[in-house]
Amino acid sequence: MAKKSLKVKQAKHQKFGVRNYTRCNNCGRPHAVLKKFGICRLCFRKYAYEGQIPGIRKASW
């Protein structure tokens, strides 16, 4: 329940722009969220390895 309430709190429009923050759409994590994908680095890594994010693959050079 705590994560659901935090997601609702984050979705509200804040009076000051500094108070806005991103939260992972999948797990609700507030830190290390990739804005382009809307998910945190942990979920991004998991989905990338599973091949669920089109165009993303592990780098090798």
Swiss-Prot record:
Cofactor(s) required for function per UniProt: Zn(2+)
GO MF assignments: rRNA binding; structural constituent of ribosome; zinc ion binding
Cofactor, how bound (note): Binds 1 zinc ion per subunit.
Keywords assigned by UniProt, alphabetized: Metal-binding, Ribonucleoprotein, Ribosomal protein, RNA-binding, rRNA-binding, Zinc
Residues involved in Zn(2+) binding: 24, 27, 40, 43
InterPro entries: Ribosomal_uS14 (IPR001209), Ribosomal_uS14_bact (IPR023053), Ribosomal_uS14_CS (IPR018271), Ribosomal_uS14_sf (IPR043140)
Record-level GO cellular component terms: cytoplasm; small ribosomal subunit
GO biological process, one term: translation
Record function comment: Binds 16S rRNA, required for the assembly of 30S particles and may also be responsible for determining the conformation of the 16S rRNA at the A site.
Family classification: Belongs to the universal ribosomal protein uS14 family. Zinc-binding uS14 subfamily.
Subunit note: Part of the 30S ribosomal subunit. Contacts proteins S3 and S10.
Protein name: Small ribosomal subunit protein uS14
